């Protein structure tokens, strides 16, 4: 994939701004049609949530907002996010942002759990990350979908993190996860989500790191036998809308979108992700045998990762940030 440079993004954003509607300028009763993109297939929690979200938004706005869902058909996350600035899609959902402010959140052990992540992101740290996202991509953050745990999967069985040293492991192009794998002695290999299956199948990598639920939906267990049951980071999907599309909505429509996301995220995203863990791991066992789901010492993961997490937090957000995060 050819990367889009910042000049292209800014130019596209400026052009889009000239054509955008001012807030509330839409004629009463007119339907705003939007395109949504996510790299996973329709069976993932992320995409099932978005079907429910936008159906509910349509009801609450009397069909004033209608969103067409494109799940796993428009490319990887980087292409989708950049596509928002270019106008090819209007709403993006995914892990990737290419911003340090969000990307360091993906290092294993950075958050204790999804509830802790929400407390941090709802405060000043999350507000700063959102501002960076808006400036870079001309996009407004609608909310964070807590997807549940990320996991580490390997073709070869491991019993501790020492054994991933030297392994080529697929990682998203996300700093927190790339740095984490380096920190543990592995060789991170950035590969788009929609290319993971083939990379495992043809031997490009020895395993991968990704969110558990989309990995099961993508049947990655067919090409990577073992998976750690331990959380290896938190899945935090950004739901963002282009500022161009956001301006097409009236003030009341904007409030409906934000309120509906907040209401549904707790049950249809966060709790759904927690509920799916047992089912997803059982699917892995059924495909590869009872010993294919491996559990290691979780506190060992946290201890190993703390020096890196402290460095990243204090480097990106300023001295003392890691202590603040731990106190929340």
Regions found by a protein language model. Name each.
Residues 117-127:
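A gly/proline- and charged-residue-enriched helix-loop-helix capping module
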Residues 2-4, 8-20, 24-116, 134-328:
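N-terminal secretory/targeting leader peptides
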């Amino acid at each position: 994939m050819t990367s889009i440079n910042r000049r292209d993004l800014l130019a596209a954003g400026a052009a889009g701004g000239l054509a955008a509607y001012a807030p509330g300028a839409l004629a009463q009763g007119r339907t705003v049609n939007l395109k949504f993109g996510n790299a996973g297939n329709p069976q993932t929690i992320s995409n099932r949530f978005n079907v429910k979200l936008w159906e509910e938004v349509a009801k609450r706005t009397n069909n004033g907002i209608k969103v067409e869902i494109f799940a796993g058909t428009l490319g990887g996350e980087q292409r989708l996010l950049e596509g928002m600035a270019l106008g090819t899609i209007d709403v993006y959902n995914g892990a990737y942002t290419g911003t340090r402010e969000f990307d360091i959140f993906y290092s294993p052990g950075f958050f204790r759990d999804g509830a802790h992540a929400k407390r941090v992101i709802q405060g000043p740290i999350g507000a700063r990350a959102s501002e960076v996202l808006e400036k870079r991509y001309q996009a407004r953050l609608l909310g964070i979908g807590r997807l549940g745990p990320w996991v580490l999967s390997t073709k070869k069985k491991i019993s501790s993190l020492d054994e991933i040293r030297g392994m080529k492991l697929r990682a998203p192009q996300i700093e927190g996860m790339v740095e984490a794998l380096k920190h543990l002695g592995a060789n991170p290999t950035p590969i788009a989500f929609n290319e993971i299956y083939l990379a495992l199948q043809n031997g490009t990598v020895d395993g991968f790191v990704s969110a558990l639920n989309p990995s099961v939906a993508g049947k990655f267990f067919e090409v990577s036998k073992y998976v750690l049951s331990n959380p290896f980071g938190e899945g935090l999907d950004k739901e963002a809308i282009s500022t161009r599309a956001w301006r097409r909505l009236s003030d009341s429509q904007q409030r409906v979108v934000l309120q509906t996301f907040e209401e549904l995220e707790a049950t249809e995203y966060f709790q759904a992700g927690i509920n799916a863990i047992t089912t997803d791991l059982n699917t892995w066992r059924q495909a590869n045998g009872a010993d294919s789901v491996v559990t290691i010492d979780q506190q060992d993961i946290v201890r190993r990762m703390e020096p890196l997490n402290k460095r990243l937090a204090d480097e990106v957000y300023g001295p003392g940030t890691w202590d603040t995060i731990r106190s929340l």
